[in-house]
Amino acid sequence: MKRHHHSVFPRAPRTAPCRACASAVAIASLLGLPRVALADDALPSKSTTDAAPAGAAGSAKLAGSGGAAQALPAISVGAARAAADAGNLSKPAGTGSRLGLSSLDTPASVETLDGERIRERGDTSVLDAVTRAAGFAANAAPGNGGTSVSVRGFSGPESITTLYDGTRMLVGAGTVTFPVDTWSVERIEVLRGPASVLYGEGGLGGVINVVPKAPRRERETSLLVGAGSYGQKRVALDTTGALGPMLSYRFHVNDDRQNGWVPRGESHLSSVGGALKLDVNPSLSFTLDYDFARQKPMAYFGVPVIDGVLDPAMARQNYNVGDASIAYYDRWARLNTTWRAAPGITVRNQFYGMLTDRHWRDSESYALQGDGSVLRSDYIEIRHHERQVGDRLDTTFDGHLLGRQNRLVVGAEFNDVSFVDTSNTPFDGQSVVPAFGFDPGSFSSPDATVPVFRTHTRQAGVFAEDRIELSDRLSWISGLRYDYIDYQRDTFATPSSPASSFSKTFAHTSWRTGLVFSLTPDISLYGQYTTGTDGVGSLITLSKSSSAFNLSTGDQWEAGFKQAFAGGRGAWTLAFYQIVKRNLLSVDPQNPGQTIQVGKQSSRGVEWTGAFRLGHGISIDANAAFLRARYDDFNESVDGASVSRAGKVPINIPQQTANLWLDWAFAPGWRAGAGLRYVGRSYGDTANTVPLASYTLLDASASWRATKDLTLSLYLHNLTNRVYVETSQNSGSEWLLGAPRSGGVTATLKF
């Protein structure tokens, strides 16, 4: 969970951009090769601004990077589906496939969270929004960037892939810091289950894709000001419109700061971004996007506990040093091109560059002593510098195969990543403070902060997906991806060790196959089998001790049912799955001092989602997930002896989650909502001796449209003021608690 475990999670160098990638992009742009967006927005990108329902009478929409929509032969089963789509089942589900299929036509568990509804509920962070989706639970800590979640029995940035506009930054040192806020979000799509066949290594548990708002030709501006508990102050702006007959724009800015709910808990988030879209003609469009975010999150690493018992008086304490500092700086740039080359042929290209700089300087480990004092250790200073340049090109072919309607996507992706780690390893330094009423002191370490290592990773992948209609009701969807990764790590000399280098290559193939049977135009049954891979740590910061091992592998069986009913005013889904992950690192039972790659972990479960528009302004969204996650073959070294953890629940994995949200537009211009969020019991250690109690949170919101342009809103979170553990670290001896009761008000002006 911590990004500073240098033996497993390193950090790497800054390198020059991949010239081959840049050349490829230049050629692609000259040829008009682009980033395809298909019927109902094939890709998980903001290209879909006005996509038609997947079953829209014989034709679908091609929207290129926010570009002009064009008619395409529809890939859907049966007659047109209702436009009122309560569960988003008939809308694009690009994160689950590059084929431009709706959720009803995709043999996978996908869910779409609408950006407007996210903001209406007061969920200002991506983490808060995503954990209202079925099966997702927060696992966030400053060490992983404050973004980590769990789903389907797996957790962390390596197993749950995060995308922005369909693209991911490769994970370094177990840390992902972007995207974070929801002000500029059009929608968030989630895919539950392995996704290596779509996005490469990682993502065995699932995928989160944050899709930002795209430029529109209709002029609209939104201005928000707000204030809330713990000194919160917020201001945000979003504007879009046309700049001529061919050019449109979008610009957004957001600033959110507060004092925090623990001493010295200040935080500050600023983000700014924009996009320009050029519609050259109805067949060709370009979109240039740029996003920048600066975060200074709360420097809080939790409170110490003994034997899983929390002293309530310590719940709002902060044991970090007085001058602790955490900062993340992220910059993302993307050039999207969409070209309708010929009837039935669409080409898409995305050229992208990402840069992140991160800094931690604090004390992160706390232990209660016999006299009631707190021992602080792990005086850590770490800097990450990561740079990634890449390009993704794919082409979609619509036609017929053996007389049946067929859609094929083929493509390739390239990434060049450099990473530099600077730190004060081995993180010595400690202090003792009273549990209450103490001087937090300042950061002091006997170890100098110096460059430790750099890495250079080159990744290349080719992929293909196909959908063929075997009959009017039955379709077969399949996919294949091959990835090759070349990795090099250079460790700098220190007073205690000489310089060293090593290199490693990985090659892996992922695939999936599935069937969808349409009982009616609004009811589908599906089944699928998928394979995937996970690194034994963060792949681009692989340590020497882990270099002897291969990627972990996994596979999933899934079957499910999806239905829209009542003219689209209701929808529900049901999914059953089993995932098995193999080749985990495990202690050798015969030699506890040696690690071998033989471990196995599995999970199986059931997930249900429902959305209902009941009339009279009442709507309900609900979901529930139940799973059984276990280590099947896993050993740890305890006091020099090998101890089996077979049958134990993996750390920080709740076995049940559920969400409920009720909205009521009870009068013209008035709306009220309330929601429950339930997270079941989990464990803070692999021996399952430190249980983390289940919890239920109650949130509420209300809004009044005072005038045509002005809306006033109220948001309340954790109304019962529940003290709960969001995640744990250090084998369950340190608990990071969730936020207490809070509230806020906003005024939003649209013109």
Stretches with model-predicted labels:
Residues 256, 260, 273-340, 350-386, ...:
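Acidic/polar loop-and-plug regions of large Gram-negative outer-membrane beta-barrel proteins
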Residues 578, 597-686, 720, 750:
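Gram-negative outer-membrane beta-barrel transporters
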Residues 171, 183-186, 197-274, 280-284, ...:
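Outer-membrane beta-barrel translocator/receptor signature
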Residues 279-281, 386, 405-407, 413-415, ...:
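Structural signature of Gram-negative outer-membrane beta-barrels, strongest in the C-terminal barrel
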Residues 336-340, 345-364, 524-526, 551-635, ...:
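Membrane-embedded beta-barrel scaffold of Gram-negative outer-membrane proteins
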Residues 294-309, 418-420, 486, 516-558, ...:
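Surface-exposed extracellular loop regions of Gram-negative outer-membrane beta-barrel proteins
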Residues 112-115, 120, 127-132, 149-194:
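Periplasmic plug
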Residues 678-685, 703-751:
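C-terminal beta-signal and adjacent terminal beta-strands/loops
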